[in-house]
Amino acid sequence: MTGMRGLSVFISDVRNCQNKEAERLRVDKELGNIRTCFKNEKVLTPYKKKKYVWKMLYIHMLGYDVDFGHMEAVSLISAPKYPEKQVGYIVTSCLLNENHDFLKLAINTVRNDIIGRNETFQCLALTLVGNIGGRDFAESLAPDVQKLLISSSCRPLVRKKAALCLLRLFRKNPDAVNVDGWADRMAQLLDERDLGVLTSSTSLLVALVSNNHEAYSSCLPKCVKILERLARNQDVPQEYTYYGIPSPWLQVKAMRALQYFPTIEDPSTRKALFEVLQRILMGTDVVKNVNKNNASHAVLFEALSLVMHLDAEKEMMSQCVALLGKFISVREPNIRYLGLENMTRMLMVTDVQDIIKKHQSQIITSLKDPDISIRRRALDLLYGMCDVSNAKDIVEELLQYLSTAEFSMREELSLKAAILAEKFAPDLSWYVDVILQLIDKAGDFVSDDIWFRVVQFVTNNEDLQPYAASKAREYMDKIAIHETMVKVSAYILGEYGHLLARQPGCSASELFSILHEKLPTVSTPTIPILLSTYAKLLMHAQPPDPELQKKVWAVFKKYESCIDVEIQQRAVEYFELSKKGPAFMDVLAEMPKFPERQSSLIKKAENVEDTADQSAIKLRAQQQPSNAIVLADPQPVNGAPPPLKVPILSGSTDPESVARSLSHPNGTLSNIDPQTPSPDLLSDLLGPLAIEAPPGAVSYEQHGPVGAEGVPDEIDGSAIVPVEEQTNTVELIGNIAERFHALCLKDSGVLYEDPHIQIGIKAEWRGHHGRLVLFMGNKNTSPLTSVQALILPPAHLRLDLSPVPDTIPPRAQVQSPLEVMNIRPSRDVAVLDFSYKFGTNVVSAKLRIPATLNKFLQPLQLTSEEFFPQWRAISGPPLKLQEVVRGVRPLALPEMANLFNSFHVTICPGLDPNPNNLVASTTFYSETTGAMLCLARIETDPADRTQLRLTVGSGDPTLTFELKEFIKEQLITIPMGSRALVPAAGPAPSPAVQPPSPAALADDPGAMLAGLL
């Protein structure tokens, strides 16, 4: 930019502007001048073009949109001289992104610079690609960049940039780096003596092993040697020593790469690595220099992560915990934070919790730290390390801290205290005390789920009921109590207040008086609960109390004209019921026991924001036997729970619905009787009128379909888990069958998802060949192990699935390409037998791969001159088949045309003289048939849309039959998954036509492809 007077003047003018408006006017004026000059190419010299492009970059840096001149910037890249080429590369990398169309024009020029002999030009090109290179660059330039990286004639500066450039290209297109042969070259790069090249190569290695660690197993001992070299400070230049620490960046990268490999089996390599880790653990201390502290602790905490990954001996684990205990007591807040965070991660390791408990007092002290982020980490750590032995101490500390905690933390704090009290309660009375204290101290932050839960425990444990009623009576004596306390106390006293009748101040009349004092202070949603309690107290008054009856009736009559419909209805109905005598007692009988169910509080805690390493807590919960309170005398989940009101459970009793439920949709899973979520019975307290019925009078539909022996057959929404390894079941996210049917119509999307993993698919189809990529993403901060994926192919497909890594690292995604070759026509599909292990929980599922018959169809629109000669050329059966199809889902002709187009059978409009008919054409590709033309005619009856005549013809009899059956399956309402998952050889028989079911139509979002299998 030296000597560019116009550029200097423009920058000075902008800086001298007095306000934003003046600056904008000056910029607009300059943009207009640049636009005019670019239009007149005859006077646009290379110098002027360079100057104007610099001005555009400066304007862009000021925050203004520059939507022209991009071509001029790109054209400078091809300039023969360095000054112009430098400007072109810099401005292009700043103004354009990887998806810009102009960038494609520069690919050849960039490639010429990369393969050229000018190292300066090579550096410019590699820098551009490393910053904004996309998929197109990856496909075109990856081999050339690889050659530069392994070239012995290139200077280290170029090779460093080549490594980082290749890293960018790999991230944009993992297929750009071919594993075959490159793994050995990668291992050779790790022998590099130049630390700059070695650091860049290690960054590349981290990305490569995260995608496929097995292919790069030869790099594992090389990473250990790098750590040995750095730990001994051998051959480390001064410029790579940071505050006395040999290349901390390279140490961190090498240890991170090692965490993607399984446990090291070679004894000598393992011994050498542990010696290095021991040296790091022993040699790190807190010093006053901030920069040295940051570097040394970055290395240390990465070493701790590696120690946990390697499942080191207990002695080293104890040393790690002791070191972290030292860090959480230092004055530097950043180190305290990292110490607490890593100690929380240590909870994932077995046999370490008892060692962490030794630092419990210091962790509790961190709850009072001025820094809120440290307090949050301390809360997470206390929550994770709690068990039966220390639950009382930790919960009491949390209750004390609740009074002084920030409002932003109180909801999370109360939720975790409630969960710990429930899971590790030594006795139920202590649990009731804790929950009532929570409500008393932080009522605004206690969700309804918490007091619903305590009511369930009290209801299900008769021995607890008198104690809970007496505690509720004590809290009602307080002058000011929270409304949530009024709710829970009113409910408990209404149900069990009569158990205190012999105690002073606990008669029905006295309980009514003390509760009625709170009525003016509560909001509208609480009044219905109080009205229900008044009715219960009136019923339990023995002998009948005329004075109490008079007071209660007065309240009911007062609210008979309430504007709130719920309150009005309760008041009217309770008033009338209270006149019925014995019938009143039958209707308001004592609440029966609730069914046993999994606590919703734990699931809610997992969704709390800003918590560290919830996965550690979940993993430990899976590895240890549960200490949670068990509800007394539980009822079956799918049985008849005794609610406050009679809910209508979703279900269908018609035979077709049952058949559809019994069929196996995508992701068919074994019957392990999962905990089916049941309706929240207590939430009905705040909903419509809650009138109890005797347990025997309430009938319920079962949640799932009924098997042959009348047992609920829960086959959907859970996962195959071997009984000996199962600790709990996973709850699927989304409907797997719907996901599969959606992928039958599109080429990318999610195939399967649960709380731990998401499996997505992206596909490309060309003729009889398909290329799919399975994306498996670990959603947790803990690795998924024992990952296995096996393809069960049908006879008509040839499939080749790339190996899936045994371990998916935390928060990482791995990809596994799948090549599909269609040999002959068939409607059978391949099945992916997928399994993984999270902690000790093994999850397995069989997932249908959306490589369906329609994927090998290519849309083809024919004119009448092309269609009818081909149609007449196809003789009768078996090349041309005709069938009257009944039980068709009634569709208008445009809807039917859209349905056909969606699976690549193209409607040819205007060819059939009858406007109620459709004709269609498509091309089918397979290895045996080649490109085969397929024709179809659909004759509909306007008077009866539930039947039609379907004619399909092609040059191959098997193709004709399979395509006819495929189209018929799309038109008929067939229970999903009625075909077998494992395909049988030979053509499948025609499915039986079934009449349409309104329930099926309403419940089947994937109706277009219903019954594809």
Swiss-Prot record:
Family stated for the protein in its record: Belongs to the adaptor complexes large subunit family.
Disordered: annotated segments: 652-676
Subcellular location: Membrane, Coated pit
Assembly behavior: Adaptor protein complex 2 (AP-2) is a heterotetramer composed of two large adaptins (alpha-type and beta-type subunits), a medium adaptin (mu-type subunit) and a small adaptin (sigma-type subunit). Interacts with AP180.
Function noted in UniProt: Subunit of the adaptor protein complex 2 (AP-2). Adaptor protein complexes function in protein transport via transport vesicles in different membrane traffic pathways. Adaptor protein complexes are vesicle coat components and appear to be involved in cargo selection and vesicle formation. AP-2 is involved in clathrin-dependent endocytosis in which cargo proteins are incorporated into vesicles surrounded by clathrin (clathrin-coated vesicles, CCVs) which are destined for fusion with the early endosome. The complex binds polyphosphoinositides.
Organism in which the protein naturally occurs: Arabidopsis thaliana (Mouse-ear cress)
S-S pairs: none
Single biological process term from Gene Ontology: clathrin-dependent endocytosis
Keywords, ordered alphabetically: Coated pit, Endocytosis, Lipid-binding, Membrane, Protein transport, Repeat, Transport
Region feature (Required for AP180 binding): 760-1013
HEAT repeats: 254-289, 354-391, 393-430, 521-565
InterPro entries attached to this UniProt entry: Adaptor_Complx_Large_Subunit, AP2_complex_asu, ARM-like, ARM-type_fold, Clathrin/coatomer_adapt-like_N, Clathrin_a-adaptin_app_sub_C, Clathrin_a/b/g-adaptin_app_Ig, Clathrin_app_Ig-like_sf
GAE domain mapped to chain residues: 742-841
Gene: ALPHAC-AD
Protein name as annotated: AP-2 complex subunit alpha-2
Alphabetical list of Gene3D superfamilies matching this protein: 2.60.40.1230, Leucine-rich Repeat Variant (1.25.10.10), TATA-Binding Protein (3.30.310.10)
Principal subcellular localization: membrane
Lineage of origin: Eukaryota, Viridiplantae, Streptophyta, Embryophyta, Tracheophyta
